[in-house]
Amino acid sequence: GAAHAAKYGHDRYGKTYAGAYRDWKPGQKIHLIGHSMGGQTIRYLEELLRHGSPEEVEYQKQHGGDISPLYKGGQDNMISSITTIATPHNGTHAADLLGNEEIIRQVAYDYARSKGNKLSHVDVGLSQWGLKQREDETLAQYIQRVKQSKLWTTKDNGFYDLTTEGTDILNQKTLA
């Protein structure tokens, strides 16, 4: 949402995916299955459907603009069950030791940056952080813009979300 994007310094919208079940709506409950970090994502989706995001609602009141119905909550009749497979609900020690270390993030982000240029056909899914070269942008301009991305210093990423600290924050937000 807009509040989240403003808080962490990235674009509000990233890549958009077409829904797999286009007729999903309140009253038509579905069963969701998530593997690994997908289990965390599903749990947070259910939290938003049920309770919304007070932070997003307040931001919209103060700044105007549109707000997704997802952030308004009140949809506790959309998910029948959640099944998670190999989901690190309490984080992983590997993520604590390596996953969120600067050197690991740097290698991963350097790879992503190099694949975000106009000539690459690889989509690393980080366009919200500016890791996609614009059509009117030179390679030098792109590299300079990427250097200034807040991605390099944020905890708003999967590396952090898989740590025991990151999952503790998620667990406090969800009813699990």
Range-by-range predicted roles:
Residues 1-30:
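Active-site catalytic motif of lipid deacylating hydrolases and related acyltransferases
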Residues 47-176:
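Helical cap/lid subdomain of alpha/beta-hydrolase-fold lipid enzymes
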